[in-house]
């Protein structure tokens, strides 16, 4: 759909996308969605923007779940993106499904620095670029309060953004009417803000 509209679509793998060893995996889980991954994404974006066929002023980012978290992290800690779509992001590991949060980050009392460093709620006021934030209201994996708390901080900072909630949809927003609507909404957003 995006290619048909003339967009270039690129996917970057950051250093914690795949772990080479159990030791590395254990180290990486303690810094999920942290500054090192963002440095990797920014390096990739700098390369992309240096290509003659790319308009460096019209670069966007999007992701779902963990990718949605990277989108928010990138948009609140860099000025590289004109717009971003974040679907079902983890904004604070305290709000994430305990089973997965403690698997990835350990318990909050065992990794307080990790939880603090990976909370995007506190950096919402630094948002650069236009954001479309999307969440299913029945998401039992990444609870909607992740988005609500992020939105509350955007409102406090008087930052304009777009938001779409899908009632009675879970994490995957997987039924055809909702998924088709979501992709059309995202395309409409790109056309307006990129």
Predicted regions and their residues:
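Cap/lid segment of the alpha/beta-hydrolase catalytic domain
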Residues: 1-64, 91-102
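Active-site loop/turn elements of alpha/beta-hydrolase fold enzymes
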Residues: 14, 89, 166-168
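Short glycine-enriched nucleophile-adjacent loop
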Residues: 68-79
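Mobile cap/lid helix-loop segments that gate and shape the active-site cleft of serine hydrolases
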Residues: 83, 89-129, 156
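Short beta-strand/loop motif that positions the catalytic acidic residue
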Residues: 127, 133-135, 139
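Conserved alpha/beta-hydrolase "acid-adjacent" motif
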Residues: 140-149
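C-terminal catalytic histidine-bearing segment of alpha/beta-hydrolase fold enzymes
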Residues: 148-149, 155-194
């Amino acid at each position: 759909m995006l290619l048909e509209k003339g967009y270039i679509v690129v996917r970057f793998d950051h250093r914690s996308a795949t772990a080479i060893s159990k030791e590395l995996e254990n180290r990486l889980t303690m810094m999920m969605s942290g500054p090192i991954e963002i440095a990797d994404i920014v390096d990739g974006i700098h390369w992309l923007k240096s290509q003659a066929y790319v308009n460096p002023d019209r670069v966007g980012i999007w992701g779902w779940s963990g990718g949605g978290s990277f989108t928010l992290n990138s948009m609140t800690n860099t000025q590289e993106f004109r717009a971003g779509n974040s679907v079902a992001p983890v904004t604070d590991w305290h709000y994430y499904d305990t089973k997965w949060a403690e698997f990835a980050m350990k318990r909050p009392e065992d990794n307080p620095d990790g939880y603090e460093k990976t909370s995007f709620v506190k950096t919402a006021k630094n948002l650069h670029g236009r954001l479309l934030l999307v969440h299913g209201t029945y998401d039992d994996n990444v609870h909607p309060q992740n988005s609500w708390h992020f939105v509350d901080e955007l409102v406090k900072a008087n930052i304009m953004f777009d938001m779409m909630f899908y009632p009675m949809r879970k994490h995957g927003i997987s039924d055809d009417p909702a998924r088709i609507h979501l992709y059309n909404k995202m395309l409409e957003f790109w056309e307006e803000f990129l």
